[in-house]
Amino acid sequence: MTDVLVPAQELDRRTIRRSDWVSCNAAFIDCRTPGSDQKSNYAFIGSGVSQNADQFVNLTELHGYNLGAAGMPNGISNNLHLHFTAEVFINFGGTFRIRWGVDGKQGEYVSNDGDVITVPTWIFRGFTNEGPDDGILLTVLGQDVTGGIIWGPSVLKEAESYGLHLTADNRLIDTVAGDVVPSDVPLIKPMRQEFIDELTSYSVEEMRQRVIQPEDRRYS
């Protein structure tokens, strides 16, 4: 086996320090929705599911997954959405109420520091920071190309009232900022009810089995 030598400068380039974090506060279609307008989105490895072409990405090399983070003050929510690939939350600090289901009423779990939560594909999920200060959820998304986001129907409708639209090729159109709605690419429409009805339901007990709390870990 051939040894792989990694120069110090390359190791330094691949080390993302806290001082290297660059937030995007308009990464998603709900960036003007009251209660969701103070989110910070970070893209450490890959662009994740950011819908903003100006999103800063620390490392663009393909890793087979995407790594990012959501930074949120107390009371701020990330609205209901689903992903095409698996997502893992790592609670980096804070208290988050995670909810799931198209209306967020299928179940809830309150996550604290150190939790690792693996979220199924094709399930609407959202979360709110209920801690006393800013919280950080690290997010790991499977595959190099994640496929984007499907937002809950109510999220898209409310965003439209603030001049925000999403194209079928995952571009955020901000008419307030002067963007023109394209004529050659259709806009994303809310998910049809017939497809929503086919989504798998998860009970609180089933979701708890997908949570690894600090006390659940066994070191060897």
What are these regions (language model features)?
Residues 88-90, 118, 133-151:
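A short hydrophobic beta-strand segment most commonly corresponding to one strand
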